[in-house]
Amino acid sequence: GFEDYADIVIEDGIIKKIGCLDGDYDNAASQNNNQSNSNNKNNKTSDSNYEQVIDAKGMIIAPGLVDTHVHFRDPGFTYKEDIETGAQAAAAGGFTTVMCMANTKPVIDNVETLKYVLEKGKKTPVNVYSAAAVSKDFKGEELTDFKSLKEAGAYVFTDDGIPLKDELLVKKAMEEAKALDMPLSFHEENPAFIEQQGINKGAISDKLGLGGAPALSEYIMVARDCM
């Protein structure tokens, strides 16, 4: 491996060379820190060697970021956002891979809707993946067809911000997901204990008379699903 302060040549969004600008990764990696630093100072390549040079001072150079929870609101709520505009915003922020949630209209609980999202995502500048729902129409009553959704390209099963209150359904979902080697993501919050969404229960919520959401609502659901 190579760990040092070094020059990086980035072209077309790809790291083309690491190390001395007129050397290469292997040569730079084979030298000690002092030698590498010396070469970096003495073997600079002038800007004239490149058709375009972007000054990246003050910027961050990093691998593409990944957001595993996005809401592009497509289909059904495109007056808020759609896959194209969401992907453009992601790219502008340095995110090259995103995972769309299934709370669209219709819900991504069927192969047709899932394929719509994935196909539209292929036309954007980033990798657009999608979750599929655990339960049909997010009702928490009947499981979706995990197998066909996985085969169609789903990466994870989740009912997004809606907690699954049926313990038997959760157990069946876990068993099926395990058999298919697929991850599940649950919203672990029991609404029976919540007086007011959007604020934790505590001194401030009591002072404002809002009731709030106690930590107990989360503890109970997590404990149930870990048993």
Predicted segments with their positions:
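Histidine/acidic residue-rich metal-binding segments in metalloenzymes
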Residues: 141-227
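Gly-rich Lys/Arg/Thr-decorated short loops/hinges at beta-loop-alpha junctions or inter-strand turns
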Residues: 67-70, 95-100, 126-129, 200-210
